[in-house]
């Protein structure tokens, strides 16, 4: 009788085929929380060389996946269990959607035979993700897996980047297929992948844009995280240097050109946007962050040249001139057009001089405030010390993750970015809770860089348990917590607000004063510091930065420093 192993070809299940498909299509990292029915999928992915970073919560894992997509230009992969795991993962998927970052969420789901019967964690997950997914696929048979994986990966990076979703039922994950057939399916998918078609000629739009910039008396270049995602830093540098036009980065555009660049208008923002007559806006949306491009913040007659990869965005904003295209490509074409007939404002140009003068004045005023050693700490004193410590780091610039109200607002003005994609913050939605996930994504995507998170205590609390994840993977991340005892700080209520049967309860904005956040990481073997003076903070930063090990620096802040809602109190 023949040995059965000699006659039966080797087989694999759906878990292995998902892992194989991801690996063959270039995926190197995954983030997620395992459980029924996807634990084996994570293990199989690791066995094939994919690094799986296991989190405590799908929200943080999803935020990590979205940021990884931005930092690398490749879709970040989130793996979740079914039902509530998928729902928790929506935080990351929606974050990718609103920030236009490539990401794919893969969730297990209940057995197809049990749909509608109240199965374990049953949910119509395709319907649940619809609002935040560019493309949602469900593999109904094991043989569909490679094609489904390929489609969601490709769609995530096509056109305007964003999140996609792949649903894999439990029975499909368990379904068997011969290894030879599986390999054939994966190979066929690899061969059939097509690059996104390049849009037709932009010659007329490029000529019009250059003409507008050439004739402008007070031109301004504005760029955002879309330009950073596009890797447009070299093209932007060339454009600014050949034209002498001042530039203004949005918060996550900082670093594409150094904040210290002579043509930076960051410290003269109000003057720059209020007086410019032509604004070239690249990879940045005219949303609330840029005051919708409307007066009184902007001149009512300003002419916008809007460069965006999304035609829908241009149709929404109705600029004077819209150019649909990738930021790197379009800026390169502008440079080529200008080269044929160069123009440069020059440092002595009145517009350039006025921007430079105002930036210098505002910078000097800020430095006077920063130079003061205020104890108990306000926000400025520790932020200056952190800035100086980050600038002193040798080698590649650290990635700065910023989250909070006052903490993020002050950090945006004080911390200096010199290299592209070295600042991650709450983004388009102003999302709190992204901090630790972003830190982990940055540490994984750029292992040669130190990651420094500057967090408010409220923002830190959303994902604080992920400090264990930092320690478990020994990531070079230092978390600096601005501990002012609550959301915005201490109890700021007026007498008329303190009444009723629960008036003795803490204010809705209050936390336990002087909480020992540094002890949380110590519970897992990381290093914790508590600091209340400039010398203590300098010492903690010097030691933790040099060690490049997981650490939490707990900075005690005056609970009444800062403002409620930071710079957005008018919206509260």
Curated annotation (Swiss-Prot):
Q: Where is this region: Thiamine pyrophosphate binding?
A: 407-488
What EC number(s) is this enzyme filed under? 4.1.2.63
A GO cellular component term found in this entry reads: cytosol
Question: Top-level EC class, please?
Answer: lyase
Give the sites modified to N-acetylalanine: 2
Q: Tell me which cofactor or cofactors this protein depends on.
A: Mg(2+); thiamine diphosphate
The record describes how the cofactor is bound as: Binds 1 Mg(2+) ion per subunit.
Keyword presence, Acyltransferase: no
Catalysed reaction, written as an equation: an (R)-2-hydroxy-long-chain-fatty acyl-CoA = a long-chain fatty aldehyde + formyl-CoA; a 2-hydroxy-3-methyl fatty acyl-CoA = a 2-methyl-branched fatty aldehyde + formyl-CoA
In alphabetical order, the GO MF annotations are: 2-hydroxyacyl-CoA lyase activity; magnesium ion binding; thiamine pyrophosphate binding
Query: Which positions in this protein are listed as binding Mg(2+)?
Result: 457, 484
Superkingdom classification of source: Eukaryota
Tell me the keywords, alphabetical order: Acetylation, Lyase, Magnesium, Metal-binding, Thiamine pyrophosphate
Which annotated residues bind thiamine diphosphate?
A: 58
* Assembly notes: Homotetramer.
Family, according to the entry, reads as follows: Belongs to the TPP enzyme family.
Question: What does the UniProt function comment say about this protein?
Answer: Catalyzes a carbon-carbon cleavage reaction; cleaves a 2-hydroxy-3-methylacyl-CoA into formyl-CoA and a 2-methyl-branched fatty aldehyde.
The identity of this protein, by name, is: 2-hydroxyacyl-CoA lyase
């Amino acid at each position: 009788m023949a040995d059965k192993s000699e006659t039966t070809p080797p087989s694999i299940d759906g878990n292995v085929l998902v892992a194989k498909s991801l690996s063959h299509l270039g995926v190197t990292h995954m983030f997620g929380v395992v459980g029924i029915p996807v634990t084996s999928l994570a293990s199989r992915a690791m066995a094939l060389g994919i690094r799986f970073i296991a989190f405590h919560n799908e929200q943080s894992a999803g935020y990590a996946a979205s940021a990884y997509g931005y930092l690398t230009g490749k879709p970040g992969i989130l793996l979740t269990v079914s039902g509530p795991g998928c729902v928790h993962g929506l935080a990351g998927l929606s974050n990718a959607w609103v920030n236009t970052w490539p990401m794919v969420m893969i969730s297990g789901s209940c057995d197809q035979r049990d749909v509608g019967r109240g199965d374990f964690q049953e949910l119509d997950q395709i319907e649940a993700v619809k609002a935040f997914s560019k493309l949602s696929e469900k593999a109904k048979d094991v043989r569909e897996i490679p094609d489904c994986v390929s489609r969601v990966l490709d769609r995530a990076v096509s056109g305007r980047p964003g999140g996609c979703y792949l649903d894999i039922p439990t029975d499909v994950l368990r379904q068997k297929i011969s290894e030879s057939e599986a390999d054939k399916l994966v190979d066929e998918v690899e061969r059939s992948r097509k690059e996104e078609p390049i849009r037709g000629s932009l010659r007329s739009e490029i000529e019009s844009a250059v003409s507008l910039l050439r004739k402008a008396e007070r031109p301004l270049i504005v760029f955002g995280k879309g330009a950073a995602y596009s890797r447009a830093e070299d093209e932007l540098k060339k454009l600014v240097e050949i034209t002498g036009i001042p530039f203004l980065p949005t918060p996550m555009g900082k670093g594409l050109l150094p904040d210290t660049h002579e043509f930076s208008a960051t410290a003269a923002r109000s003057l720059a946007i209020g007086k410019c007559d032509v604004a070239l806006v690249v990879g940045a949306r005219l949303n609330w962050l840029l005051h919708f491009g409307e007066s009184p913040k902007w001149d009512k007659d300003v002419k916008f040249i809007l460069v965006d990869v999304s035609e829908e965005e241009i149709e929404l904003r109705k600029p004077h001139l819209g150019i649909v295209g990738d930021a790197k490509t379009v800026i390169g074409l502008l440079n080529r057009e200008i080269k044929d007939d160069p123009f440069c404002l020059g440092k002595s140009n009145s517009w350039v001089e006025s921007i430079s003068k105002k930036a210098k004045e505002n910078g000097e005023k800020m430095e006077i405030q920063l130079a003061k050693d205020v104890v108990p700490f306000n926000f400025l004193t520790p932020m200056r010390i952190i800035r100086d410590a980050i600038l002193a780091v040798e080698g590649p610039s650290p990635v700065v993750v910023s989250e909070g109200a006052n903490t993020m607002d002050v950090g945006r003005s004080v911390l200096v970015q010199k290299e592209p994609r070295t600042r991650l913050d709450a983004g388009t939605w102003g999302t709190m809770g992204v901090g630790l996930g972003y830190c982990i994504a940055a540490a994984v995507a750029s292992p040669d860089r130190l990651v420094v998170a500057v967090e408010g205590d409220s923002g830190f609390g959303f994902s604080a348990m992920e400090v264990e994840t930092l320690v478990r993977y020994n990531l070079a991340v230092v978390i600096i917590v601005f501990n002012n005892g609550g959301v915005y700080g201490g109890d700021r209520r007026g007498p008329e607000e303190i009444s009723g049967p629960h008036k003795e309860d803490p204010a809705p904005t209050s936390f336990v004063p002087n909480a020992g956040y540094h002890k949380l990481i110590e519970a897992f073997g990381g290093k914790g510091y508590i600091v209340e003076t400039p010398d203590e903070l300098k010492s903690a930063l010097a030691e933790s930065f040099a060690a490049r090990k997981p650490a939490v620096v707990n900075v005690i802040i005056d609970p009444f420093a800062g403002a409620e809602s930071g710079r957005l109190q008018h919206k509260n």
